[in-house]
């Protein structure tokens, strides 16, 4: 029976990348790892074997969708928390790219770089969650968003989360500092317990923000959908991955569905941020094309009758008068 922090039960159900670097030494291969009961079949393309083909495609889709969301956020120049939420999407893009490299088998399990790349992936996972938590404080206006204080606090907190998760993961995989592939309590606490606590705090803060400070209640729907997609992804991955994999003949597994649900959850984060963020149109006009395009020329009479000719303190210029070939060179008052 597995105890607290043991990955045996988790890895037998979910085909996680870290499962190839934790657990006892396998007699068949002589390497450390826990083999899942069922995982998606490999795809051979151009004499290259691609692991988790469907999941790899979803990582590419996630990268494309993240680029689109980043472009939309960047177009809102005066939105509250613009720089902070951009950091979240940049980190999610890095996490998706690293997951694509690992899940597709670009660096195969058992190779020397594999533990380091999985440690980087775990570091990005913790960094994304911490960045989301810090973004949750921006809406309360405890400090001015976009200032060096706000941006650097976000960067330092995110870097600290990445460093802790990376070092704990690498120490576990390499048997450093009293940790080992069979002593995974520290890894479990960092990856699962701390991240779950941060997500709970973020959701609680956003519900409080909407109910106490906003008149519109529609953002609660975005929060609800985000929670639903995230929880559904975790259930698919950790509870039903093997059953799904066996039911559809190894074509898909829980990792694919978890990747889809995580992408939908991130999209709900964008939708929620966009719904509670107002933009000053005076400063965002530059993002729209043809704002000053002249649709139709004014008639001659309307173009000459300008407000400047009606100024009580101004003098009429000869340019305000219609041109006449026989008129005198000087004004009548001279």
From Swiss-Prot:
GO terms for molecular function: unfolded protein binding. One of its GO terms (cellular component) is endoplasmic reticulum membrane. Pfam families: Chs7. The chain crosses the membrane at residues 49-69, 88-108, 123-143, 159-179, 185-205, 220-240, 250-270. GO terms for biological process: cell wall organization; protein folding; protein transport. It is a multi-pass membrane protein. Keywords: Cell wall biogenesis/degradation, Endoplasmic reticulum, Membrane, Protein transport, Transmembrane, Transmembrane helix, Transport. It is found in: Endoplasmic reticulum membrane. Chaperone required for the export of the chitin synthase CHS3 from the endoplasmic reticulum. PANTHER family: CHITIN SYNTHASE EXPORT CHAPERONE. Interacts with CHS3. Belongs to the CHS7 family. This is Chitin synthase export chaperone. The gene is CHS7.
